[in-house]
Amino acid sequence: MTNMDFPRITKETYGLDAVEYVSTFFRDKAEDMEYLTNLKNECEKYGVKSLIIMVDGEGSLADTSLAARNKAIENHYKWVKAAKFLGCHSIRVNAAGRGTMGQTQAAAIDGLGRLAEYAAGHGINVIVENHGGNSSYGKWLAEIMKCINKPNCGTLPDLGNFYEYDRYRGVQELMPFAKGVSGKTHDFDQHGNE
C-alpha cells in the first residue's frame, strides 16, 4: 500500500473519513507539489480528511547543541508546509535529546517554541507525543508546554508510551495541552473488553 492508496482503503475498507500520515513513508516527497496535490486529490475524491503528519527522522528538537537543534527546527519546516497544503491541523514531533532532564527540557522549550512560532504563521499545530526518552514522563512534557504557552503547541498523549509511570496520571498531566489522543489496545475477551 502507498500513501496514494491510503485514502481509498481508509474509506472503502474501514469506513473511516480521516487519516494521519507518517513522514517516513514519503520522506522525499514533502516538497513535491505534484505528489502532494495528487494525495490531496485522492483524499477529496474519497471524502477523507488529512489530520496529522507524524514527523520522524528530522533531527532532535531537544538537542542540547544549538546548531543541531537549529537544523532540526529547519528540517521540520517542509512538513509544516506539507501539512498546511494537505489540510492537516498538526504535525506530530518528538522531543528527544541527550543530556539531563533539565538540559533537554530547556532545549525542548527552545526548539519546540521556535518551531511552533513558525508553524503558527501557517495555521498548524506542533504536537509532541510522549514517544520515548524524557517525553515519556508526563510531568516533564507538561512543564515544557506550560513554559512555551502557545496555543498551537500541544501534546498527543499516547496511553502506551509512559515509562514506569502511571499512565493515567500522565494522561491527566498532558490532556490540558492535547490536540489529539493516541491509544493502544492489545488483547480482548469475547465481549470486546481489553
Language model features: what each stretch is:
Residues 18-19, 109-194:
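Acidic/histidine-rich catalytic cores of soluble enzymes
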Residues 23-25, 56-59, 92-99, 132-134, ...:
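Active-site-proximal loop/turn and secondary-structure-junction residues that shape catalytic pockets
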Residues 50-52, 92, 128, 157:
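Hydrophobic residues in well-ordered beta-strands that form the structural core
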Residues 1-85, 103, 113, 120, ...:
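N-terminal pre-domain/capping segments
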Residues 80-103, 122-135:
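Active-site groove signature of glycoside hydrolases
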Residues 36-37, 69-70, 98, 109, ...:
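Alpha-helix boundary/capping detector
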